[in-house]
């Protein structure tokens, strides 16, 4: 640690904040180096503000209600037991890593398809959206297979009980099975549809999937029927299929 004091969990929190601030500063610096000085104005006109809000508000609400849904799921895990919550937390890092590895396709879809639509090249936009979905499917299948193969080695990296490792390994299998569906939703909903301005449509899909299917299933299976955590995770994740 190069002579620095051991901070434990607080140190991890400090490191996260510092890394995020550093990343933001680097992005701002690169932006100004590429484009020089820019003139910032918030005067969009009446029609501009209206259109901006119509596009932005559904995105904000969608992310807000999705985050609230994830909080409810965590609440369910916590009330099922310490091992269950620890097992789910164990998989968080690798889930974020694998989804993050393919999130670039969603961002690329938003840029590429948006550019084609802006140029009125609708046929090319459709063809390229299919190609991006295909790449996402292939990539997610490969990562799913790798994740299933190394799941036991991954959980062995943590100093936890055998029960927690068992739960974590099983949850990773379920996540790997559902990953292709998650990635397709990410590319189509988060990239293709939003690039076409269908933000309200995406918001409705996300809210219905989360609050009409995912959250009720999590509450029923986890708190009422008291099913094992692996089955709870598998059942409420079927919201991805509905989306």
Predicted regions span which residues?
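Transmembrane alpha-helical segments of integral membrane proteins
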Residues: 1, 185-189, 213-222
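Helix-terminus/linker motif at the lipid-water interface of multi-pass membrane proteins
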Residues: 1-7, 60, 64-97, 115-116, ...
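Short alpha-helical transmembrane segments in multi-pass integral membrane proteins
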Residues: 4-57, 113-178, 221-243
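Membrane-helix interface segments
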Residues: 8, 83-84, 199-200, 228-229
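Transmembrane alpha-helix boundary and packing residues in multipass membrane permease domains
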Residues: 16, 29, 59, 63, ...
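Hydrophobic faces of transmembrane alpha-helices in multi-pass small-molecule transporters and flippases
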Residues: 17, 26-29, 44-72, 76, ...
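Small-residue-rich hydrophobic transmembrane alpha-helices
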Residues: 74, 85-151, 183-202
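Small-residue-enriched core segments of transmembrane alpha-helices in multipass membrane transport
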Residues: 93, 207-216
């Amino acid at each position: 640690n190069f002579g620095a004091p051991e901070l434990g969990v607080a140190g991890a929190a400090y490191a996260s904040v510092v890394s995020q601030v550093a990343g933001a500063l680097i992005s701002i610096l690169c932006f100004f180096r590429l484009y020089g000085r820019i003139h910032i104005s918030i005067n969009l006109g009446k029609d501009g503000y209206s259109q901006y809000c119509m596009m932005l508000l559904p995105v904000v609400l969608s992310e807000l209600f999705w985050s609230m849904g994830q909080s409810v799921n965590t609440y369910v895990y916590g009330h099922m037991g310490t091992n269950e919550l620890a097992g789910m937390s164990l998989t968080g890092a690798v889930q974020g890593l694998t989804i993050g590895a393919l999130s670039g396709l969603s961002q690329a879809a938003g840029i590429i398809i948006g550019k084609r639509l802006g140029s009125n090249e609708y046929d090319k936009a459709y063809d390229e959206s299919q190609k991006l979905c295909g790449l996402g499917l292939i990539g997610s299948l490969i990562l799913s297979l790798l994740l299933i193969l190394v799941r036991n080695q991954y959980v062995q990296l943590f100093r936890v009980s055998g029960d927690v490792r068992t739960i974590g390994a099983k949850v990773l299998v379920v996540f790997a099975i559902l990953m292709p569906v998650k990635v397709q939703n990410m590319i189509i909903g988060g990239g293709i549809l939003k690039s076409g301005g269908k933000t309200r449509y995406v918001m409705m899909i996300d809210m219905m999937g989360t609050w009409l299917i995912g959250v009720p299933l999590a509450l029923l299976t986890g708190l009422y029927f008291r099913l094992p955590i692996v089955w709870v995770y598998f059942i409420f994740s079927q919201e991805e299929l509905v989306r």
